[in-house]
Amino acid sequence: MAVSEVPLVFVVGTGRCGTHTMWRVFESLPNTLSTHEGAGIVHAGPPSSLGKRLSMGCMPEFNAYLYHYAGEDIFRRTFEPDAEMTTLMDRCFAIRSSSIAWCRTNGIAYCDANAFGFNFINYLHTKFPSAKFIHLVRDGYACVRSWSRRDASTYPERLPAPGGISWLLAKPAPFPSEVVHGSWAHFDRLQRISWFWNTVNANIAERFDRIPVANKRVLKIEEVTQETIPGILNFCGLPQEFKPDSLAPDDPSAGPAIEWTPENERKFNALAAPMMEKLGYALR
């Protein structure tokens, strides 16, 4: 396989949307390096590399900088990175760039499923014009309920464990120009996660507007089946020999979940209706 033909695939989403599943599907393919939030195992390439574990990190620090220090003006620069922003993003992405270079040298496809990588989309399209991007989505009610179980790192109502702070800070907070900014301090946890689901999906959708149709796809995790996987792999330019058991349920959330009472549905709909409708999910 020529260097220019090596597939590069980036899967982005809110988290709890199926990135773990897509990582496992890609990992089951021959001649492919698949990572989930920076972690993976080398299954192809020189014998000396086989079995090597990668731990590149999920890059939460860049999101934490944008949302909790830099401000909206700097955040907007990531949509069309200038030279200074590109230099910063190059440094943040350096370890992955090295892995991609290794894959290209060895003729191996590179697949990156990362729920923290959405702010790199436009940078990556400029850096790798042939790369394919998948916006992986999940029904908002199911996704928010799943996130509600992750109370240590997702807008917790109590003090987090030290290990969860970087994950917590990677979650966005409203910029002053946003309508909900003045209400944020009074939002309960359900409202914050609902806003998060809508905001991250809207962010990705706006970034996708700047990417050619041939390089992008919006994919509902509910529609990822043995029957649809071949078409997904064809879009990505990847081998078709996936293992069906890679679709088995995995990485479930644990802990108590919110209940969809009429009041909670009202709160969710007030914040997340725009993206529910845009993505083709029915409101309750």
Positions of PLM-derived features:
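PAPS-dependent sulfotransferase catalytic core
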Residues: M1-A94, P244-P249
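PAPS-dependent sulfotransferases, especially Golgi type II membrane carbohydrate sulfotransferases
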Residues: M1-V9, P156, K171-R284
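Hydrophobic/aromatic beta-strand patches that form the interior of the parallel beta-sheet core
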Residues: V9, L33, P129-I134, R217-L219
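A short acidic, amphipathic alpha-helical/loop segment
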Residues: T21, F120-K127, G231
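Acidic-histidine catalytic/liganding microenvironments
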Residues: L29, F128, I211
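Short aromatic-enriched loop/helix-cap "lid" or pocket-rim segments at secondary-structure transitions
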Residues: G45-L50, L124, R145-R150, Y155-P156, ...
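Anion-recognition interface
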Residues: E61-A101, I108-L124, P156-I193, Q226, ...
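Conserved phosphate-donor/acceptor-positioning beta-strand/loop module used by diverse small-molecule
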Residues: A113-A115, L124-R149, E222
